[in-house]
């Protein structure tokens, strides 16, 4: 079994640090349980998807520290961190993780506001005459 693997995931402004160790299924997110921090079942399923590829979810303990961004950004950042931690544990499932898109860092970020415009792309009203 594994001693401990640590990995980081990012999405927009959200940064997540995930510690994966063998245990009995205890998941700690910023000092709270997974159900308290991420109340929606969809969010929890998204986060735990890479761990399900290893098999038994309850044979691992997770300690997650996440900060910045919104809730969905934190969910995707945590999923990426968990997928990287799982990859350190089991190298042979890399192709499966990659096929599911769990190892892909989403590069999209907020576009900066340009001068002479209201927002990043929105201009002031233009009058031809």
From Swiss-Prot:
Tell me the Gene Ontology biological-process terms attached to this UniProt entry. Answer: translation
Looking at the keywords, is Ribonucleoprotein present?
yes
Say which domain of life the source belongs to.
Bacteria
Bias kind Basic residues: ranges:
110-129
Residue segments, region Disordered? 98-129
Give the intrachain disulfide bonds: none
- UniProt keyword Ribonucleoprotein, yes or no: yes
Cross-referenced Pfam families: Ribosomal_S9
Q: Which UniProt keywords apply?
A: Ribonucleoprotein, Ribosomal protein
Name of the protein in question? Small ribosomal subunit protein uS9
């Amino acid at each position: 079994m594994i001693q401990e693997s640590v990995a980081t995931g990012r999405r927009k402004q959200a940064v997540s640090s995930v510690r994966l160790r063998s245990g009995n299924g205890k998941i700690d997110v910023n000092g709270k349980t997974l159900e308290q921090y991420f109340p929606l079942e969809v969010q929890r399923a998204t986060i735990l998807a890479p761990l399900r590829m290893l098999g038994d979810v309850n044979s691992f303990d997770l300690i997650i520290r996440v900060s910045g961004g919104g809730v969905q950004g934190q969910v995707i950042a945590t999923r990426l961190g968990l997928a990287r931690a799982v990859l350190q544990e089991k190298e042979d499932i890399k192709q499966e993780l990659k096929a599911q898109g769990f190892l892909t860092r989403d590069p999209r970020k907020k576009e900066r506001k340009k001068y002479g415009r209201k927002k990043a792309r929105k201009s002031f009203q233009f009058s031809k005459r």
